[in-house]
């Protein structure tokens, strides 16, 4: 089996030349070969050793004779990108007459920094720059993964520098690379032609441009071995790698590694999907759905029986790359999906959501890339206001192989679409986006795409509104910076949002809360009161003091509902009442610092207890795992799956946005109290958030 991997392609190349259909692998190999020829002609690239934090700077130099571009790359080491403050110190470009210019005297024509901006002649705090304890008066700092491109137009003959990590980096490591080409346009063309394949590949590399300019096949080999390290049994893949290593031609090596990458990625994806195939959970959901009006148990019982047999047979054959085993596993996943998406709560066959087009960064995205705040203490005012490619979409044909997507509304100004709320009538939705002057406001659009309008009108030039909700009587509750105060520990840089009540007919605006710190997520409870999350700072351990509150819609009788007097959890976001319950709700628990806004999915019931784990009914999808109280700042760092923005269908089934593991995409899932996790929509290059079933 392993030998066939190489022999097939070699036999084809040895025969008569035939016209081949271009695919992403062939196109990539061709582009890499052309770029490698250009690099070799210029004796490039020049690579440093793996340089770690606190090491002394290492000299690097390059011959620039006849070159039009100087490309300086800082690439992260195998330990990730934390504190990788790569620095080009005492860097200068030398002309043929011996005169020179310091690199810090020039501005790059193009640059990307892995964190913040490039910095000249200072460390990241504005102090004199040190590497290994030595002070440098001339330096350019560019965090990995980063690149700086200088158009030098054959003016210089030599480049010299000392490279290392700024002493602020107590951890971290960087590879430094000097090149004469940076294939930004070539990478863009490839990505446009093969967005799915190149988008997925980019999740495993430090940028398509750097990958295209690699001088050998080691990058492809590392990609495959990295994927293999995630497999329960990697023997097949590792043996195939050994076979490819014997090949002498670089292009052939690259091609075969990329073919092996495709198969290994397929195995990895199946392993992940199979880890969520829980027959006990599926049986429990099946038996529960039999009690629901509209569920055709007779139709789906044969599918369940087939799945039972597939699970009994097992799926270990996928690890040998056997095609029949791979197809059988894919059929089992499809059978699971068929059963669970037969849920009558999806009979409306429409789900509203916000879609963010993320391109090659989709696998690395977290909640702030989907329009949320970048931390757990700020309101929407601190979130990014522009640079998004986002729209509100309607998903249909949910049970089919090809889910249909219809764009309902897309901001024209690059704003995100946040805080998506369905109207009581099910024919329109409320959301937050920026106005032409970049202030946030609450807007509405009908589900047919018509009727777009601003909902809150106010003459004050510095007030903003966001995080709104409909009241049954037609009024609106939203958050606003109406108090003109900021979060204390960041010197007021993050504005605080308190709630206001707005009457559209009269444009009357009244402040409801007068809290020192933020309110979030007002939502109407089943008893007509409004619950929300309140963060309080004074005289409290503020890392752990985001409390679920409730009040009358007019702001009277503000009371704690859950979490007062407890340090677990730190934060409870995205709360939604459970249909048919007077007190129970679902929400996301998260930390203070660390991962922002997303976290663990919890069902609460304050009727059981008003704080701590005692008030938690269960964690989804871990019904049999006890919830252990943990007093920890970064509560959900390293926790997977990550969930955000749940919507209850009833008290057992929920729609939610989720990222199941660090390499995954943000998709929309149907989850339940039985531990089933079923994907409704997940697409390469995109991220989804705020799913809501369309029901009238």
PLM region spans:
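Multi-bladed beta-propeller domains
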Residues: 332, 401-415, 446-464, 502-517, ...
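Gly-Asp-aromatic-enriched flexible segments
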Residues: 17-188
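Beta-propeller blade signature
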Residues: 176-179, 390-396, 443-448, 493-506, ...
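Residue-level detector of Asp-centered blade-edge/turn motifs that repeat once per structural unit
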Residues: 346-347, 424-425, 471-473, 525-527, ...
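Asp-box/WD-like beta-propeller blade repeats and closely related beta-sheet repeat scaffolds
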Residues: 438-501, 506-520
